[in-house]
Amino acid sequence: MSILNDFERRLGGMVEGFFTKAFKGGVHPVELAHHIVREMDTNKTVGIRQVWVPNQFDFRLSPPDRERFAKTEKALRRELEQVVKETAAERGWELVGAPEVVFDTDSSLSEGTYTLSLIHI
């Protein structure tokens, strides 16, 4: 099953990369939400009685994307944290603590690109 998950993740990355290049205009919040859910699934830890998933996510955005989100960053962060809570609840996953989404600027990134780092449990 992990082969299929790996293939799906790679295919998803290629498709997202294609659309990012084909349709410039920066990062969209829905991309960030999908990436969080995918990383929760990929990085889950199966315990004896529970499945644990990461609860802290650090997005590094290009300067133009970060600037575009500046006015709505607080609301976007709350919405993405809610996605973490709801996804965990729907799938029966456990969080170690409250979800936390952080945005930082990375001047080496071009508009429409971002990186996501997880703070593992």
List PLM regions with ranges:
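N-proximal, solvent-exposed amphipathic alpha-helical segments enriched in charged/polar residues
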Residues: 1-47
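Short beta-strand elements
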Residues: 2, 48, 95-99
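Short glycine-rich, basic-tinged beta-strand/loop micro-motifs
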Residues: 10-20, 48-71
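A general secondary-structure signal for short beta-strands and their flanking turns/coil
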Residues: 33, 52-54, 96
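Short, non-transmembrane amphipathic alpha-helical segments
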Residues: 36, 72-92
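Alpha-helical bundle protein-protein interaction modules that mediate dimerization/oligomerization
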Residues: 83-117
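Conserved small/polar residues in nucleotide/adenosyl-binding loops
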Residues: 119-121
